[in-house]
């Protein structure tokens, strides 16, 4: 059975927050995980991160922001049109303008806010708030 690295990564971050900790390290790291972390840093959910080379491969060290509460992968990965974004925001986010959906589009990974500005759809990957 295949392993969902995105779901593992996001549930790891949520568990770290629930334990009351701010710093963590995660292995294995893929380009998708790095892009997710960059979006979360840009949106203010991660204070800082760094990639560390080890004998097992790359490890990502993350410092969570006080604004991070929860993150989770969306399964199944729904294809979403621009006009349907609000429906999924209501479904996955706790309040209006609180949190972000992360979509995979032809222009790379973007948030729901960027997708609305660019008027494009994509495939739902995760949510974070």
UniProtKB/Swiss-Prot annotation:
Disulfide bonds: none annotated. It comes from the Archaea. Pfam families: Ribosomal_S8. One of its GO terms (biological process) is translation. GO terms for molecular function: rRNA binding; structural constituent of ribosome. The keyword Secreted does not apply. GO terms for cellular component: ribonucleoprotein complex; ribosome. Keywords: Ribonucleoprotein, Ribosomal protein, RNA-binding, rRNA-binding. The keyword Glycoprotein does not apply. Part of the 30S ribosomal subunit. One of the primary rRNA binding proteins, it binds directly to 16S rRNA central domain where it helps coordinate assembly of the platform of the 30S subunit. Belongs to the universal ribosomal protein uS8 family. NCBIfam families: PRK04034.1. This is Small ribosomal subunit protein uS8. The gene is rps8.
